[in-house]
């Protein structure tokens, strides 16, 4: 990774670090589960990964703004992600390792 790339990605990495710090320190004290899937902190990490710092933070702020009794919650994926990405599935595996096709 070049120095230019490192500087470009630094704000995103700092934001992700703050989210991880929140998850390790403050979140366990709150105790109440998130009404959304994925959780707000997981949503924020995915938004930062896919959209970088500025757009990722904007999406996160919009998501946190939905957190209240006026919104029913539910599944709310980061734009441009799939359900597999939301579930953190790195790869879909095929149970048939023989290579035979069953037409």
Swiss-Prot record:
Membrane topology, as annotated: Peripheral membrane protein
Keywords recorded for this protein, A-Z: Cell inner membrane, Cell membrane, Membrane
Coiled-coil regions, chain positions: none
Subcellular compartments: Cell inner membrane
One Pfam family this sequence matches: YidD
Family under the similarity heading: Belongs to the UPF0161 family.
Function, in words: Could be involved in insertion of integral membrane proteins into the membrane.
Entry protein name: Putative membrane protein insertion efficiency factor
Taxonomic source organism: Chlamydia abortus (strain DSM 27085 / S26/3) (Chlamydophila abortus)
